[in-house]
């Protein structure tokens, strides 16, 4: 009897560690290979004239050009802007939890009620920009730190940083090649590596393109 209790408790602890005991957890979007099964509608949460809006649209266009070049019908969807404010303290906490790769409570109602599937939050907070996925409602949230903070003040960094986080949102993970878009932890490259006085998006690796082809094949369709 004692052995049976130990086994059951061990399984419960394992399930808790894997986020299996509750469906109300947010998952850090680091692991690669989880693609969209529909065209995600995008909602940008930002002040009306936020200077990061052009970089956000450029990053979305970069990915849609990439999908066209790969021959897949998948695209990032229509873009809507709302001027709601997500508390910077919440985004800072969420960023820290994503970095720790831990499960955490699902997005609050303020976020869940926002329109769209993919939320790009242009914040005034100071945190590590991140991407997180809701396990309950299917929303993905990309949090972008203040444009007044280093290294987002450097030329060419902002559009590449947003494109990098959108890369996570569409299913790509990190690599260790600092000359490419998806380089990131645990490799030492950070967003300042995107600095350039020539406007350009950093490239994808061949492996990134192979993975995108698997997630979004030429016969991809919404389901």
Model-derived segments and spans:
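Positively charged n-region of N-terminal signal peptides that target proteins for export
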Residues: 1-4
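Bacterial N-terminal signal peptides
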Residues: 9-24
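Signal peptide processing junction and immediate N-terminal pro/mature segment
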Residues: 23-31
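Residues at or immediately flanking beta-strands
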Residues: 41, 71-73, 181, 223
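Metzincin-family zinc-dependent endopeptidase catalytic domain
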Residues: 53, 57-169, 173
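Fold-level signature of zinc-dependent metallopeptidase catalytic domains
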Residues: 30-62
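Metalloprotease/metallohydrolase-associated module, dominated by Zn2+-dependent proteases
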Residues: 140-152, 156-157, 173-223
């Amino acid at each position: 009897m004692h052995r049976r209790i130990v086994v059951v408790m061990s399984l419960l602890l394992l399930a808790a560690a894997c986020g299996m005991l509750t469906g109300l957890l947010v998952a850090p979007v680091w692991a690669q290979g989880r693609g969209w099964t529909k065209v995600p509608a995008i909602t940008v949460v930002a002040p009306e004239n936020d200077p990061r809006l052009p970089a956000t649209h450029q990053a979305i266009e970069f990915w849609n050009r990439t999908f066209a070049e790969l021959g897949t019908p998948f695209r990032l969807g229509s873009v809507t802007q709302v001027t709601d404010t997500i508390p910077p303290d919440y985004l800072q906490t969420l960023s820290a939890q994503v970095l720790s790769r831990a499960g955490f409570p699902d997005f609050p109602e303020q976020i869940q009620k926002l329109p769209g599937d993919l939320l790009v939050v242009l914040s005034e907070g100071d945190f590590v920009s991140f991407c997180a996925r809701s396990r309950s409602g299917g929303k993905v949230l990309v949090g972008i730190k203040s444009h007044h903070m280093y290294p987002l003040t450097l030329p060419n960094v902002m559009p590449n940083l947003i494109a990098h986080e959108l890369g996570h949102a569409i299913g790509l993970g990190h690599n260790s090649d600092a000359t490419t878009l998806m380089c990131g932890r645990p490799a030492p490259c950070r967003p300042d590596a995107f600095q350039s006085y020539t406007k350009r998006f950093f490239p994808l690796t061949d492996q990134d393109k192979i993975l995108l082809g698997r997630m979004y094949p030429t016969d991809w369709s919404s389901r």
